[in-house]
Design a protein with these regions (language model features):
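Glycine-rich anion/phosphate-binding loop at the beta-strand->alpha-helix junction
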Residues: 193, 240, 246-332
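Catalytic-core signal marking the mid-to-C-terminal active-site face
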Residues: 2-29, 65, 71, 293-445
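Short amphipathic alpha-helical segments with heptad-repeat character
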Residues: 135-143, 147-150, 154, 184-187, ...
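Proline-centered turn/helix-capping motifs that create local helix->coil transitions or kinks
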Residues: 104-110, 198-199, 280-283, 318-322, ...
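Active-site-adjacent "gating/activation" loops or surface patches in catalytic cores
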Residues: 223-247, 251
Length: 445
């Protein structure tokens, strides 16, 4: 069976491939191999720039050609690495051998080949490649999509800034609010957590077999290898080196990133559920696309499926993100291998997250405001002005105002404009205060 969108086991690469293809250059097997090649090449170049005595004679004009090994890396190259791995049964060693083959193609580089992967362990490559892929995926794909969602919400918040709406707390009518303000709450929350995510450190482990640069020191004790590692990781990869590690990354900062994404996802779940409710309450209608079907049995239905799709995908994403954040920082002694297979899944929750963001955006762009229904609900819920009345009465030192309004409103009788105004007329306050109270409506409170 040929692997394609119909035969893929995961819906990320199957049904939703069109939405997640943007992540393939960061989290696919091909992408991981390319990132490994990139780190190996940049490390070799940095050794030449040091320079190690044996690399002083390396022609720096070849650096451009070396960088083309990863900048022009294609699927055929990745397939070659996989073929080598069938023999080595080791993915990172296969990358090293592939680069040596590429050196042979350039020619004249035989004396320098053993400085590929010099003094390193596999995790020096993996624990730089993976955070680098996350960094670039966030910058190139995730942040722009979240920004697009925030922008759409901000447009609605501005457009509907002065649209009054009945609030609901505990599912019951509460003091009126403005539709634009309620949407602005989500803009604020998302911006806050997006800033928090952007402020998370992207760190890398780079320090040899057990984090001590043992091999580097024994071969070249005259160099400050910690300073070298700091410079390489920051200048060549744009990451921050973890100063104290075992064989692998501590993963603490990566856990912070996963937790931050999970908080953003949780906010979007909250948003999805609220807009689902607003549609159910008929505050919004949905644009209908010719040919689409809402239910296989009920022809009249236009379901809020985009919000439901988003909520489901975010639930999956958050479960995996929580697992990653909890599992990765835990490893037996100086390392066990459990992080290796787990790290291969870092793209999965981001895949479900971008599916969700796109679904939420799709749902938002279908909205048609039903101001008539919002106005109707306000007209039918005059009891909500009770808070305003009792607060003004408190200002006027009126005796027991809260209790008076409670006695009026907590009955089974319907509260309307007439009921409220009749009550106001009975109050022992000045005519000016009565006029002030009479002017309050569910629409302007």
């Amino acid at each position: 069976m040929t692997l394609d969108t119909l035969t893929a086991v995961s819906p990320i690469d199957g049904r939703y491939r069109s939405k997640t293809e943007c992540l393939a250059d960061y989290f696919s097997e091909y992408a991981l191999i390319r990132y490994r090649v990139r780190v190996e090449i940049e490390y070799f170049i940095t050794l030449c720039e040091l320079p190690l005595p044996q690399l002083k004679s390396f022609d720096s004009s070849l650096f451009k050609r070396l960088r083309e090994i990863y900048s022009k890396f294609d699927e055929n190259d990745a397939a070659r690495v996989k073929d080598i791995e069938k023999i080595t049964n080791h993915d990172v060693k296969a990358v090293e051998y592939f680069i040596k083959e590429e050196f042979d193609k350039i020619g004249g580089l035989e004396p320098y080949k053993e400085f590929i992967h010099f003094g390193l362990t596999s995790q020096d490559i993996n624990n730089t490649s993976v955070p680098l892929s996350i960094k670039e995926a966030l910058e190139d794909v995730y942040y722009p999509q979240v920004d697009e969602l925030i922008s759409q919400l901000q447009d609605y918040a501005t457009e509907w800034e002065n649209v009054p709406m009945l609030a609901k707390t505990h599912g019951q009518p509460a003091s009126p609010t403005r539709l634009g303000k309620e949407i602005e709450v989500y803009v604020y929350r998302l911006n806050e957590q997006l800033t928090s995510l952007r402020n998370c450190k992207l760190t890398a482990k780079f320090g040899g077999a057990t984090g001590n640069y043992n091999a580097h020191h024994v071969a070249y004790p005259q160099y400050d290898w910690k300073a070298f590692g700091d410079r390489f990781v920051s200048e060549k990869l744009g990451l921050e080196r973890e100063l104290w590690t075992t064989q692998i990354s501590n993963y603490d900062h990566l856990g912070s990133i996963f937790d931050a994404i999970r908080r953003i996802n949780t906010i979007i779940i909250d948003l999805d559920r609220d807009f689902w409710m607003y549609i159910s309450m008929e505050y919004f209608k949905q644009k209908i696309k010719a040919g689409e079907v809402g239910s296989s049995a009920m022809p009249h239905k236009v379901n809020p499926i985009d919000y439901e799709n988003s909520e489901g995908n975010l639930g999956i994403a958050n479960a995996i993100l929580q697992f990653l954040a909890q599992k990765l920082p835990v490893s037996r002694l100086q390392r066990d291998l459990t992080d290796s297979t787990v790290l291969r899944n870092v793209g999965v929750p981001l895949g479900h997250s971008v599916i969700a963001i796109q679904s939420t955006l799709k749902g938002l762009r279908k909205l048609i405001l039903n101001e008539e229904k919002l106005s109707e609900d306000l007209d039918n819920t005059w009891a909500v002005v009770a808070e305003a009345i009792q607060t003004i009465l408190r200002r006027e030192a009126y005796p027991h105002p809260y209790e008076a309004l409670k006695a009026l409103t907590r009955t089974n009788k319907k509260m309307n404009e007439e009921t409220i105004h009749e009550f106001i007329k009975t109050l022992n306050v000045s005519d000016s205060v009565k006029a002030e109270l009479m002017a309050i409506t569910p629409h302007n409170y």
